[in-house]
């Protein structure tokens, strides 16, 4: 049995932080955490066992089970004999009509934002590092990994298990 409030359906064991806004006709699955200052648009389907931080989600977005969105990226600065983690203060922006397959991990930006364009679909287990930008109408197959600060244009398809190095610009 689920709970419904203002046309939003909530599963069991959900944690919602302060200043979270959730649009109408959205469904949130069991054991999902939405941390403070997250915006979720209308007509979204947010699955179970998901963590969302530092993220703005557009309308008609599907996030399948197990995704981690807006987590801290892997960014370090080597100084003398130690590595120091640099801050990740950016966000994740999921535009309208985006779909994330199960167990995707989308890191928030270090200073700017990590962005997925409208009508873009990610298959299961895709990883996007900090500051990656994917254009509109892209299809990304399973187990693709994007290293930090890579930009992908519009209407791009990427086959399964591809590894994309950091700081690249892939055109339309």
Name each model-derived stretch:
Residues 2-172:
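Structural signal for interior beta-strand "rungs" in well-ordered beta-sheet cores
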